[in-house]
Swiss-Prot record:
Originating organism: Rattus norvegicus (Rat)
Family: Belongs to the PP2C family.
PANTHER family to which the protein is assigned, alphabetical: PROTEIN PHOSPHATASE
SMART domains xrefs: PP2Cc (SM00332)
Transmembrane segments: none
Gene3D superfamilies: Phosphatase 2C, C-terminal domain suprefamily, PPM-type phosphatase domain
Entry membrane topology: Lipid-anchor
One Pfam family matching this protein: PP2C_C
Reaction(s) the record says it catalyses: O-phospho-L-seryl-[protein] + H2O = L-seryl-[protein] + phosphate; O-phospho-L-threonyl-[protein] + H2O = L-threonyl-[protein] + phosphate
GO molecular function, one term: manganese ion binding
Lineage start: Eukaryota, Metazoa, Chordata, Craniata, Vertebrata
Cross-link (Glycyl lysine isopeptide (Lys-Gly) (interchain with G-Cter in ISG15)), chain numbering: K12
The name this protein goes by in its record: Protein phosphatase 1B
Residue positions, PTM Phosphoserine: S386
Length: 390
């Protein structure tokens, strides 16, 4: 669960789509981890009468990808088909769910899928001990329902600022710790029984076998927290991401970075790729996944912002050339040396929230062109200290 590769796998999975007045893009990268355990869901138009609703989610698997992958395909179905989610009239016709129907139905869907997966032979006999966080949004014409189970996170940006974010479920949180202790467990080194770093998750059945306790009273609970927010014209975008992103970017930093990138590109896959690359260069050692959902009021491409960004790229290209020419007299410098020099300079118009790491790819491209035989180290590595102030 904590094994790393010698070099990160930087190939990305991308997708995008649009509908119901929304646009979305997503990106995922294995990074330094030995396995890719993340998964995602993106559904614009929920079947069976909720075509003007949409659902997006990110799942951060651990100890394997089995639970994350199954939930990415089947969680929405477990939510929308249970009796708590949708009431019916006397003729049996499904009615538009109320706010309370939706919130109760989401909770029921999580408990049902968790109980259903428990019967899978590999999960039941302990051959597979995987679990997964889940963070998502269900978007109706009037509301945004934020759903969280674990330490992945969702953030809403409105009027250029963080308007709302879900709260991580960590074992050291007082309410989580109380439940863990009441179930006979302990919190050591901020982990459940010194092992698991999240206090709520789907799967993880080794932590859900305390006799006399219900499913939401176990060491690890599958119960999500669900919040509803009325949609507003000022809504700009929602970000869903696993902790591989949040480990190196705060809510505010990520929203600032996304906002600035939307002003230079309307390609949401590109924006998501920039986030993932920037987090890799900031030192993230985990799998990384992000789903970006944009509303009609999301930032638009600005000619001024595009010009400013191009000027920044040209400045960085020129500085890398100067550094390498100057250092070349004593031998070609490595990329870490170039980055350390740049990190000490006052460079204007770096991407807010991303800093120099947000332009690492530009710097790498120039470095590789001038020194094609040099390994550029592939990721963050020894650059974390250089970029810590950025």
């Amino acid at each position: 669960m904590g094994a790393f590769l010698d070099k990160p796998k930087t190939e990305k999975h991308n997708a995008h789509g649009a509908g119901n007045g929304l646009r979305y893009g997503l990106s995922s990268m294995q990074g330094w981890r030995v396995e890719m355990e993340d998964a995602h869901t993106a559904v614009v138009g929920i079947p069976h009468g909720l075509e003007d609703w949409s659902f997006f989610a990110v799942y951060d698997g651990h100890a394997g990808s089995r639970v994350a992958n199954y939930c990415s395909t089947h969680l929405l179905e477990h939510i929308t088909t249970n009796e708590d989610f949708r009431a019916a009239d006397k003729s049996g016709f499904a009615l538009e769910p109320s706010v309370e129907n939706v919130k109760t139905g989401i909770r029921t869907g999580f408990l049902k899928i968790d109980e259903y997966m428990r019967n899978f032979s590999d999960l039941r006999n302990g051959m597979d001990r995987s679990g997964s966080t889940a963070v998502g949004v269900m978007i109706s014409p009037t509301h945004i329902y934020f759903i969280n189970c674990g330490d992945s996170r969702a953030v809403l940006c409105r009027n250029g600022q963080v308007c709302f974010s879900t709260q991580d479920h960590k074992p050291c949180n007082p309410m989580e710790k109380e439940r863990i202790q009441n179930a006979g467990g302990s919190v050591m080194i901020q982990r459940v029984n010194g092992s698991l770093a999240v206090s709520r998750a789907l799967g993880d059945y080794d932590y859900k076998c305390v006799d006399g306790k219900g499913p939401t009273e176990q060491l690890v609970s599958p119960e999500p927290e669900v919040y509803e927010i009325l949609r507003a014209e000022e809504d700009e975008f929602v970000v869903l991401a696993c902790d591989g992103i949040w480990d190196v970017m705060s809510n505010e930093e990520l929203c600032e970075f996304v906002n600035s990138r939307l002003e230079v590109s309307d390609d949401l896959e590109n924006v998501c790729n920039w986030v993932v690359d920037t987090c890799l260069h900031k030192g993230s050692r985990d799998n990384m996944s992000i789903v970006l959902v944009c509303f009609a009021n999301a930032p638009k491409v600005s000619d001024e912002a595009v010009k400013r960004d191009l000027e920044l790229d040209k400045h960085l290209e020129s500085r890398v050339e100067e550094i390498m020419q100057k250092s070349g007299e004593e031998g070609m410098p490595d990329l870490a040396h170039v980055m350390r020099i740049l990190s000490a300079e006052n460079i204007p118009n770096l991407p807010p929230g991303g800093g120099l790491a947000g332009k690492r790819n530009v710097i790498e491209a120039v470095y590789s062109r001038l020194n094609p035989n040099k390994d550029n180290d592939g990721g963050a590595g020894d650059l974390e200290d250089s970029l810590v102030a950025l």
